[in-house]
Structures are given as structure tokens and as C-alpha cells.
Regions:
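N-terminal auxiliary segments of SAM/dcSAM-dependent transferases
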Residues: 1-47
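Class I SAM-dependent methyltransferase Rossmann-like catalytic core
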Residues: 47-88
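Conserved SAM-binding loop of SAM-dependent methyltransferases across substrates and taxa
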Residues: 103-120
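S-adenosyl-L-methionine
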Residues: 134-173
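A short SAM/SAH-binding and catalytic strip from SAM-dependent methyltransferases
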Residues: 176-193
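A short glycine-rich, Lys/Arg-flanked "PGG" loop and its adjoining helix->strand segment in the class I
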Residues: 193-208
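Conserved beta-strand signature within the Rossmann-like core of class I S-adenosyl-L-methionine
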Residues: 208-217
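Class I S-adenosyl-L-methionine
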Residues: 222-280
Length: 280
């Protein structure tokens, strides 16, 4: 099973749990939610509106279909283009902490790189941290379904970054070799004052030599916030850039064609900013 076939299985499961009177009614719910998400992402800096709630299964399906496919490809590209990240993921064992990684972009992007690079005999443990517990159901079967020459262990852990009681007890993830932040800071920018202690905790406690891969919308609010956190915690810049990120969708169209016919094309291009940082 390749990666897009895996996403197809995840989408099939997510589609099946949506309650509606008919398939056409279910599809209409999803189409409306895709439009709603697009509108919500245009208002990520509007503090009068709370952070997006992903407890609704329709919203989770809409996100995975519309955004996860593209965002995973961006992660793959950024890893492929940075030697230190490539070497890290070729080690016999690597631990990754995917912060706000419930939608799966971080995990799938790493897997896509490993598969395309032909990596063998390695073991990757991905700690996926997110407030919405239901995301864990989406990725719990990855190790069983993915036929790969390397081993992958997704470990979902629920936390609310604004509530220290939910994350102070977690210690193991702080020894991760790589921390990923894929379109996460923009989701929580509205509550940045409450989120700052969590990010400071992670960046101050991460081990020497570990790295952070940050990618998000190319907006000064989000990028400046990350840069402030990185500077405050003495992280070294390995690479940074603002650029358009895009992906080739031939594989996606073949394996996800049923959903393309129903819901149109997933996101294919983004005006993005990324940072690759290292703990000195």
C-alpha cells in the first residue's frame, strides 16, 4: 500500500462515520464544510472568533481531504531539500514530536519522504500531540496498513497547549530528534499568550542537536511569533525562506479519484514560510 492508498483508507473510514440520511446528503455536508474551513482560515487573525474546533467528523474529513494531502507533500519537500534532516531520518532510530499534528500532515510527510528516498531498516516513532482526541483514530492503523521496509510507530497523545496540567507530565517527547510544526502556530495565534508557555517549554527543554521544522502561512503574525520564540530560546537557524510551495498531484488523482470527483481538487499551492532550526 502506498501513501495515497493509505490516505484513501483513512478518508473511507472518516467518510463512514459521518451521519446523514443519504450519500448525497453526506456529500453536501462535506462540501459545505470545505467552504466553511476556507472561510475560517481567512480569519485566523480575528481574535473575536475562537480557534477552529475539529470535534465534528465532517470537519475532520474536510480537512484531511482538502489540506492534509498538500501539507504532507510540503513536509516531504522540505526534508528532501535539507541534508541534516535527510541524515536524521536515515538513522536506525529517530523520534519525532508532531506538535498540533492531529491532522496527519507531519506524519504523512515524513513517511512520504522515507518511501520516496527508499529508506530501509530504520525505525521512526512519531509522537502526535493534539487537543482533539478523535484525530488519533485516523492514524492508529498506519503501522499495520503501510507496507514499508522501515518501521513506523505513531503514538497519539492528547494535550491542550493552553493548559499546563495536560502537558507538563509528558517528558519522553522532549528527547525527540525532530519537532514539527505544520500550520499549527496560525491555528493558535489567537491564543498566543496562553500558548507561549508550552512552546517555551518545548524549545528550552529540547536536547542539544535536535531540530525543529516549522512551516505555515506566509504571514508576518505567524512567522514573527515563531522567530520570537526561536530567538528567546537560542535556536540556531539552519535554513529559512518565504516561497510558494506546490505539489504534483498525478499520484493523488489516481488513488483519490473518487473523492476528487465528489469534492474537487485538494489544495495544490501555498504562499508559505518555513524555518529549519537547531538546538545548539
Amino acid at each position: 500500500m502506498n501513501l495515497m492508498q493509505l490516505i484513501k483508507v483513512v478518508l473511507d473510514d472518516a467518510y463512514g462515520v459521518i451521519t446523514a440520511e443519504s450519500e448525497s446528503a453526506r456529500d453536501e455536508l462535506i462540501k459545505a464544510e470545505i467552504d466553511s474551513l476556507s472561510s475560517a482560515y481567512a480569519k485566523l487573525t480575528d481574535r473575536k472568533i475562537g480557534p477552529i474546533d475539529y470535534s465534528d467528523p465532517v470537519k475532520r474529513f474536510a480537512y484531511i481531504f482538502k489540506y492534509t494531502v498538500a501539507h504532507a507533500d510540503y513536509i516531504m519537500q522540505l526534508i528532501r531539500n535539507e541534508e541534516e534532516l535527510r541524515k536524521m531520518l536515515c538513522r536506525p532510530a529517530t523520534e519525532v514530536a508532531c506538535l498540533g499534528g492531529g491532522p496527519g500532515s507531519d506524519l504523512l510527510g515524513i513517511l512520504k519522504y522515507l518511501m520516496q528516498a527508499g529508506v530501509k531498516d530504520s525505525c521512526v516513532t512519531c509522537y502526535i500531540f493534539d487537543k482533539e482526541r478523535a484525530w488519533g483514530d485516523s492514524w492508529s492503523d498506519v503501522a499495520r496498513l503501510l507496507n514499508s521496509p522501515f518501521r513506523v510507530y505513531p503514538v497519539f497523545q492528547q494535550m491542550d497547549i493552553t493548559d499546563p496540567a495536560t502537558w507538563k507530565s509528558y517528558q519522553k517527547f522532549l528527547r525527540a530528534d525532530l519537532f514539527t510544526l505544520s500550520y499549527f502556530l496560525s491555528e493558535v495565534w489567537k491564543i498566543k499568550e496562553s500558548a507561549d508557555p508550552f512552546f517555551d517549554h518545548c524549545m528550552s527543554q529540547m536536547k542539544r542537536g535536535s531540530m525543529i521544522l516549522f512551516v505555515d502561512n506566509n504571514s508576518s503574525q505567524f512567522v514573527d511569533w515563531f522567530d520570537e520564540l526561536a530567538t528567546r530560546n537560542s535556536l540556531k537557524t539552519v535554513k529559512k525562506e518565504s516561497c510558494n510551495l506546490a505539489f504534483s498531484n498525478s499520484e493523488e488523482k489516481k488513488d483519490l479519484g473518487l473523492y476528487f470527483d465528489k469534492f474537487g481538487w485538494p489544495k495544490r499551492e501555498s504562499n508559505a514560510a518555513y524555518r529549519i532550526m537547531k538546538k545548539a
